[in-house]
Swiss-Prot record:
Chain residues forming the annotated DNA-binding region: 23-93
Protein name per the record: High mobility group protein homolog NHP1
SMART domains linked: HMG
GO MF annotation: an example: DNA binding
Gene3D superfamilies associated with the record: High mobility group box domain
Protein's cellular compartments: Nucleus
Transmembrane listed as a keyword: no
Length: 97
């Protein structure tokens, strides 16, 4: 069987399914920026709405062009979301016990 598969015969352990009630992880400052910027980019360029790679490159370039001062609001959102996540994670752990 030429080119059949790369398998070595070693079984990998199955990944445990995530509990749908578990809290969502905190977003990074970049992710808050990307959510906001993606909407702007698609509104300005509807023809590239399906080109995820191009949009990602544009978002990355825009993020890198921001000064530290311009990134502060997104860092603040990230800090607030991290606090939310830690609180929800603690509540979730209490419910599981």
């Amino acid at each position: 069987m030429a080119g059949a598969s790369d398998r070595t015969g070693v079984r990998r352990p199955r990944k445990a399914k995530k509990d749908p009630n578990a809290p969502k992880r905190a977003l990074s400052s970049y992710m808050f920026f990307a959510k906001e910027k993606r909407v702007e980019i698609i509104a300005e360029n509807p023809e590239i709405a399906k080109d995820v790679a191009a949009i990602g490159k544009m978002i990355g370039a825009a993020w890198n062009a921001l000064s530290d001062e311009e990134k502060k609001p997104y860092e603040r959102m990230s800090d607030e979301d991290r606090v939310r996540y830690e609180r929800e994670k603690a509540e979730y752990a209490q419910r599981k016990v």
